[in-house]
Amino acid sequence: MENKTKKFHLASVILSVICVVFVVEAAAPVASIGNSQYFWWIFMMLLFLLPYGMIAAELGTTYVGDGGLYDWVNTAYPTTKWGARVAWYYWINFPLWMASLAVICPRLLGTMFGWNPSPFVSLLIELAFIWIVTIVAFFPVCDSIWILNLSAAVKVVLALAVGGLGVWYVTRHGFANAGGFVTYLPSFRPASLSYISVIIFNFLGFEVVCTYADNMTKPKRQIPQAIVAGGIAIAVIYLFSAFGIGAAVPTDRINTDTGLIDAVSLITGRTGGFLVGLVAFLFLITLFGNMISWSMGVNSTAAYAADRGDMPRAFSLRWEKNGMPIGAALTSGIVASVVCLAGVLMEVLAPESSLFWSFFALNLVMLLLSYIPVFPAFLRLRKTDPERERPFRVPGGQKTAAWIAYVPMVLTILSVFFTAIPLSFDRETLASFLPITIGSILAVVIGEILIRLRAGRASAKETD
């Protein structure tokens, strides 16, 4: 059911792009690479962000609807199950990501109020975060636009504040990670390469905004305008915030889950107090903004795929009041809750492990897998559907389009490999990678089983 009273204007669409794509919590893992992070940021901006943004703008304005990635791939390959795979990978990443952010919430509240919550209280906080996000997803995105706008504004303020504090720190104390020119060259150490996927993750999400098309006044104009304006703003903000963390915090002291808070603490010389508590509070707001903005896009895509028989039937359940996909939202909340409960067991068995990175890296792998078929689908749709009107078209001929598609696709495949596959077999590396490797394999296998079961049921119905 379309909401006829509320519509996005261009400014809100741009802020939605920033809210969806700019991910504050992912800055710290990248900063832990060291000075070479600046090379990787610029490299990925040119060879991934720019081509992917143009492809998303063309496909999002040509094939407007709730299906997003699934619709693009399914339209390009209608007789295959690649659309179903994309829908599954795209959806399963979300509850994993929600769980990874949920485990940060108790620490943020502890920083804000100066207390250390018990494991039981921490679990309750995590579950509260998950189900607040889940319930908000029961309502149209235009009803929550103030949350997205607030989150986008807070993200920009946080990034600029961290960057500014980094500049202030350097003028008084010098660079925390000083080094010669060689330290700014790309690092190919396995530990560094595994974090490069986070940079690509930081640039994903333009297609989520495309699923908001029904809530826009002029989607075919607003989508490409927002992607260009938002993409430029995001690139500048990322570089400035990355400089702030990298300039002021030694790489060996960067925590992958609370690195932003650690940066402010180290720069100010305080582990608590008003400023650190305020940053923790603002950080918490951005986590809600991330999940709420992504939940609406992911749930819409999952429900759209379920309506076409490519996701379990439960995902197609919609609220009669407003047509929102509550089946997908509830399933996401349940899976994220189960993951957090499993996290309690993981902490007991391996107290030194980083729950945030384990869940976040698994979410990374699944999300990146969902994007790989999009790039060849873009080229195929150019060939099989050339007469369709394209309000925005990637400039250049077919050879240019091939380069624009295959370069980011190769980078995405390499990122999945470096994130999920251990490149050495010492005990520490295996302890870090095996949960991600095993979790990724299980997620893919479960998806294939569900796809086969649905295909079997469809064949049985046709026979009857």
Predicted regions and their residues:
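Membrane-interface "cap" regions at the ends of multi-pass membrane proteins
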Residues: M1-F43, L49-M54, G180, E387, ...
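Helix-loop-helix junctions that connect adjacent transmembrane segments
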Residues: N3, Y38-F39, P117-V121, N149-A280
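C-terminal membrane-solvent junction of multi-pass transporters and transport-like membrane proteins
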Residues: N3-K4, F315-G323, L368-I421
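Select transmembrane alpha-helical segments in multipass membrane proteins
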Residues: T5-V17, F39, T79-I92, I125-F129, ...
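Hydrophobic transmembrane alpha-helices that form the core helical bundles
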Residues: A31-S32, P51-I130, I135-F138, L284-T301, ...
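A generic transmembrane alpha-helix motif of multi-pass inner-membrane proteins
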Residues: W41, V170, L362-S370, G397-D464
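TM-loop-TM module centered on a large, flexible mid-protein loop between adjacent transmembrane helices
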Residues: D71-T79, T111-W115, A226-I292, M311-N363
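Membrane-interface loop-to-helix entry segments
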Residues: V121-H173, L204, I227-I232, L364-P373, ...
